């Protein structure tokens, strides 16, 4: 509330691993404040971007360049966002949906605090989660084959990003949703 009272526009990043509660917290803030929420999961790489070199980069499995150009820069400038979600089923980008910048704007998702994106936020929050609780939540919300992708591929990508770029320590707040 203090930030929105002091500024005409506030951008908040909610960062953390899979199943840590990022989307839930984003939805809660949206319900309380009526603010837009933008999801890093909507910015996975298109097939032609999925190269060995790109995946070798910590945080390289999201299209942060497109996220910066299509979401963060317009929000910072107070312009509407032409939000184009990546469809994981078809590997295509959906037609744009125009979203007006709010006083409070939430970005939720792993990779939201990549150094290319972090300077655009006024506040950043990290949600830690234990490996046990993460596994329990992923198994509860996903089919076995999809859960296996999390354990074998996505969580190792996230962990490498968190470690290589010291993400947790670069966030302003750490809120445990691991209860």
Where are these regions (language model features)?
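Short beta-strand-centered segment that lines the nucleotide-binding/catalytic pocket of NTP-utilizing
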Residues: 33-49
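Extreme N-terminal, non-catalytic leader segments
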Residues: 1-12
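ATP-dependent NMP and nucleoside kinases share a basic, alpha-helical "lid"
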Residues: 92-141
